[in-house]
From Swiss-Prot:
Annotated pathway: Amino-acid biosynthesis; L-tryptophan biosynthesis; L-tryptophan from chorismate: step 5/5
Name of protein: Tryptophan synthase alpha chain
Gene this chain is encoded by: trpA
Entry keywords, A to Z: Amino-acid biosynthesis, Aromatic amino acid biosynthesis, Lyase, Tryptophan biosynthesis
Catalytic residues (positions): 43 (proton acceptor), 54 (proton acceptor)
GO cellular component terms, A-Z: cytosol
MF annotations from Gene Ontology: tryptophan synthase activity
Residues spanning the signal sequence: none
The reaction(s) this protein catalyses: (1S,2R)-1-C-(indol-3-yl)glycerol 3-phosphate + L-serine = D-glyceraldehyde 3-phosphate + L-tryptophan + H2O
EC code(s) of this entry: 4.2.1.20
Length: 249
């Protein structure tokens, strides 16, 4: 199983993008320049028609990608053309995996250099079949923990976790306001008592000020909605500059 610590030094810069937004050409050009960016780990959002965990901005981006014909096959074709030293993680809804076939999907993802899967709507209790395939192909199925998750459930969730722990810093959908820093610090301490895996904080982190604050709390910071916003205007040079601004030290 991949050790995500090898992809960053002091703190991980984790970004999220919707593949195919604002168009396939921009996505591909961005991925070709990924190694020149401050991003250590990139979550690749696979567009889905019912993105229940996503806020309006990401949901709209997914719709635009879908309207242009971006599907799981074009995602795989795109990634086959990409070579990068950075860690790639799929953020994908379970129905897409199930429809493609669990083993077939995980095997294909592994062949394309994917290190891990994040499946936001899949509960721990329903994840056995996917865990089995991920273990077979040495891909991490990422565990999500909320600040509101009770301690005993945290212990249960992280016991067999792989890759990293995704700590949801806000309650609800992506792009919403983050909870108090002190609450997050307490949750990180609680999680650390059960696992040595790195803990990355995401949801509600909107700008460089937020990133700098969260670096003091966790091992990595995940920025989603604000990164997707950078892509709206479509100019790659501006996109790269905006991403550098979000993650600057």
């Amino acid at each position: 199983m991949v050790d995500f610590r090898k992809f960053y030094k002091e703190n991980a810069n984790v970004a999220y993008t919707v593949l195919g937004y604002p168009n396939l050409q921009t996505s591909e050009a961005f991925l070709q320049r990924l190694d020149q960016s401050p991003i250590d780990i990139l979550e690749l959002g696979v567009a889905y028609s019912d993105p229940i965990a996503d806020g309006e901005i990401i949901a709209d981006a997914a719709k635009i990608a879908l309207d242009q014909g971006m599907d799981i096959h074009s995602v795989f074709e795109l990634l086959a053309r990409i070579k990068t030293k950075k860690a790639l993680v799929f953020m994908v809804y379970y129905n897409l995996i199930f429809s493609y076939g669990l083993e077939k999907f995980v095997k294909k993802a592994k062949s394309l250099g994917i290190c891990a899967l994040i499946v936001p709507e899949l509960s721990f209790e329903e994840s056995d079949d996917l865990i089995k395939e991920c273990e077979r192909y040495n891909i991490a199925l990422i565990t999500l923990v909320s600040v509101t998750t009770p301690k005993e459930r945290v212990k249960k969730l992280v016991k067999h976790a792989k890759g990293f722990i995704y700590l949801l810093a806000s309650i609800g959908i992506t792009g919403t306001k983050s909870v108090e820093e002190a609450i997050l610090q307490d949750k990180v301490k609680e999680i650390r008592s059960f696992t040595n895996l790195p803990i990355f904080v995401g949801f509600g982190i909107q700008n460089n000020q937020d990133v700098k604050r969260m670096r003091k709390v966790a091992d990595g910071v995940i920025v989603g909605t604000s990164i997707v916003k950078c892509f709206k205007q479509g100019n790659l040079d501006i996109i790269m500059k905006d991403i550098e601004e979000i993650f600057k030290k």
